[in-house]
Amino acid sequence: MVSSNTAVTQAQPSSSGFRWLQLVMGIVCMAMIANLQYGWTLFVDPIDGAHHWGRASIQFAFTIFVVTETWLVPVEAWFVDKYGPRIVIMFGGVMIALAWVLNSYADSLTVLYAAAVVGGIGAGSVYGTCVGNALKWFPDRRGLAAGATAAGFGAGAAITVVPIANMIASSGYQTAFFDFGIGQGLIVFLLAFFIQKPTVTLPPKKKQLNLPQTKIDFTPPQVLRSPIFWVMYLVFVMVASGGLMAAAQIAPIAHDYKIATTPVSLAGFQMAALTFAISLDRIFDGFGRPFFGWVSDNIGREHTMFIAFGTGALMLLTLSTWGHNPLVFVLATAVYFGVFGEIYSLFPATSGDTFGSKFATTNNGMLYTAKGTAALLVPAASIVAASYGWQAVFVIAVALNATAALMALFVIKPMRRAFIHGNEAAAAETAPGAKTA
């Protein structure tokens, strides 16, 4: 079960600065779509104040966006692998601009929901393309490249959240939607002209023995038929759902613990516990993605997963047991987000190592749909909390993270090596010139 194109062609020198330029442009594009997810919360109350649709109805647009952004990535990625990244990123730039322009004129929930679909398609086009392109340019540093690209998705919101909030306050949310929508979309559209895929397959460094990497480019149908893909998908869903269930409830938990407004002093700063925790969230999340990607490039994907998932379980257990202490709440939350965001660097890198570079965008896009699947499970946290309290939510999240950590070492690691070596041995036996019985 191998694709016909299995040859690895000698490429440009891996030290070439051109591929780093490609990475930087991808990160900037990711920063430009970040506000569609992380900046949305700034608009909810102003929209409700203008139209009185209710927070729940307005927030449903966000759910539509996440599902659309995630589940359509494999389709968009197929176009990338077939026609190249440029046209897909250009399309994404147009769509993200159109989405926020529609939001600026939305006078009904129908228009708001339609804009969420448009924005999801646009953001997914840019996200899947930039991560997939990074995997192709950096087979020797897939973890770092995927992590840095994914970090751009959070960094963009950190840079623009204050200007957006100021514009909403001074000119209204409609103006903020329109102006930032056009600006973000235009930057993505223009950068698309300069983004390209490698003209030849870049070979990974042979000396990295901790990183078993296939020499075969598996097609998407072949990937879907492989058990290792579905095991990776399951672990992705477990970590993402466990993390999202806890992360989505951080504010309610802080209020129920009666520490949300308690002052916390740390490193010369003093803020309310909840505000401090949320502020550190983006910093640690953004730093964690490239950091754990870099670590995985050096010690191996599964070993890094074990460390990250295990640390996540430990931090959730800490929150459950000692989270009533404001300082513990802030620190445990920060560390947790630092190890949670790495799923967006480790799984793309592992996918590229396992299934090859040629169809990396599509194959990683299929794996990325696990985020959408996990998002559908998040409302379960509210149901569990209402019936059994927050302790039960933490028990579930800890169990999911701990199980995922063990599966990374004792299931994914041996299965992935058997998959790579088995298929390469089969390809060698059937290759032209191979000895026959």
Predicted feature descriptions by range:
Residues 153-199:
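Helix-loop-helix hairpin linking two adjacent transmembrane segments in secondary transporters
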Residues 47, 125-138, 146, 342-355:
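Intracellular juxtamembrane helix-capping segments at the cytosolic ends
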Residues 197-217, 418-429:
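Flexible cytoplasmic inter-helical loops of multi-pass small-molecule transporters
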Residues 31, 99, 110-124, 237, ...:
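Hydrophobic core of transmembrane alpha-helices in multi-pass small-molecule transporters
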Residues 71-109, 296-302:
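Conserved MFS/SLC helix-loop-helix module at the cytosolic interface between two early adjacent transmembrane helices
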Residues 273-350:
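C-terminal transmembrane helical hairpin of 12-TM major facilitator-type secondary transporters
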Residues 40-44, 224-292:
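Extracytoplasmic gate region of multi-pass secondary transporters
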Residues 47-48, 79-80, 159-171, 254-255, ...:
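Interfacial helix-cap and linker-helix signal at transmembrane-aqueous boundaries
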